[in-house]
């Protein structure tokens, strides 16, 4: 049985509109990830936005609980039901139906569609909710209805705001299997398993804690797909269900060891974590040093450590992406489109961590030998800072053997060195929204209309004026700054990567910014004359908008070119367009070659030269997705979306664009670079900006020729390079004569250092002078890092040393046991590589 489909179809038959799963990265600054089915509807429940039509919805929402307030990461693998990634089935009513229907629907679905045994079902209600009790009594015997207090059966969105009693449905897994002290209704045992929570949002709580009835009570329900699947299949752990067992079997094949539930925590960790990793990367989250990207990194590194316990010491997680796509690609088709890109990104990150995990574990074991109960915070920090071990990974390893880490000392070192800035998810923008009069304006006027697609000039009425504190005022005096709400505005509010419009009101009042607050398009104005609410004013958008539109359209063509040349797995990770340039971030695991960049540039210019009118359509979101239009996961869309077609490009977009591709003129790539692991960036110019760029380039090239005193720049540069090479050789000879300081441990001398001279000659010299030695040298030359290692009568292999070091530096290499060389291109990580090599040698000798 496809429970996901059965659930959605059931509620669709009851008049609910099926809503696609919202992005895992929510449009909510207070949340790290979407962690519940109601998150996409939060602003509807709070009244911040009008209720939709129809006001009843159903969804299967993908959720992440790792990091932030809701963090299940530490428990995953060790319990039957904790997950970092899960799917939440839900039905929602925004002031339409209430308890009677919600309870009836839930009972019908569970007993008639899922056909769960009625004799194994129990429900709970709030101790004061007589209404819910009486409704349930129509469906189930009263002795199966339990009353509990606020702790168990009252739900609140926060300290203030919408809240209400809830009712939970439980399934009895059997006294014959569960008979512990906590295995009773209301206990913490596993016998009675909660499967569905029905929240009756009927009150508003104020700051004093007082409850007042909501004018239109709402319904929010949630049922975990993994949990109900396990019950339906008659297994006691979610991990024993058809959702996880194919992944666990895949891990068995990789490690060659059979899975046993009692000792299978590592299998379960890997099976859970690969789902989170796959979905997050598919939706544009990438490995990073902070924020969501760092949570993603923690999840992968935790899985790799558990893989290490199973004997998996080479990259393996990326191979499991195929299994996730096979299991879930039929419902989430974007997984199939991005599968190969996801695999490459994961593999690259695996290689980074696996290059240091061995030495990190050696350091961990060495410190463990000196640990009684509490593991050193200093060593935990070193594991984190040098070897990439997240603190919770170290804590996880210690928990398995009954020890703890000194987190206080770890935090102290973090603060001292400021190695990682904690991501803050509540910005100043949210404070503005909290104190502003936006909600009142929305209730009074609704969303004001943007007419800038058709015109850059208008006569509009001032509906409202806000001062700098975003409070309503009747008038803005000359010489002041404030925000104006027009009934119809030609000014584009910054969104979707496109910069805001500027312009003039009544010829002399400068529009300096335009932003959107709760659906309201507001323009910031520096006044030279008085402006009053009710005034009819002339509005004019700056000409810069025309160039911005050209760059925005070029961005769409670039996206199409990238997908055609690099593969359909390429996804947009961000963009920024203005009148002077465009910037496009996209998921791709490696830097682009000059040949690829030329192909991309030619592709875009070819699309421009073909011309063709742009086309926009307002479509139902599900219809738009089916039509092949591309959407961005990080954007939040309504029920209706604007779909833009430019030649072969078709995307969701609310921005302004050219009417015909010819208007773009020409397109030129200025720069390609890396943003973070698995994310690349292209910066480009078009139209007038491209012409200006060409002029500046010609001028700079002329200056180069003048500086070289030659019209043949290439030959002059070659001559200079030869002279530099000759000078470097002289420096190298001088460096080779320098005395090298050696360290010693257990009778073996060793050195790890940067060296300007001939590193092979120096290693040979040291090996001739010493009976037992390990030498590793780094040399920067021509934008790359050269690595050489020499070993004589020591328990290390030079080939293995350079191989691991090169991974840190983004390169590769190898060689004999006594001598080996390698290269790398990431010069920013030389210090990390030096420290790693030094620790590796110390651990081995």
From Swiss-Prot:
Q: Mostly located where?
A: cytoplasm
- Tell me the superkingdom of the source: Bacteria
Query: What subcellular locations does the record give?
Result: Cytoplasm
- Annotated residues for binding of Zn(2+): 552, 556, 653, 657
EC numbers listed for it are 6.1.1.7
Extract one GO molecular function annotation from the record.
Answer: aminoacyl-tRNA deacylase activity
Q: How is the cofactor bound?
A: Binds 1 zinc ion per subunit.
Annotated Gene Ontology cellular components are: cytosol
Q: What is this protein called?
A: Alanine--tRNA ligase
State the organism named in the record.
Answer: Campylobacter hominis (strain ATCC BAA-381 / DSM 21671 / CCUG 45161 / LMG 19568 / NCTC 13146 / CH001A)
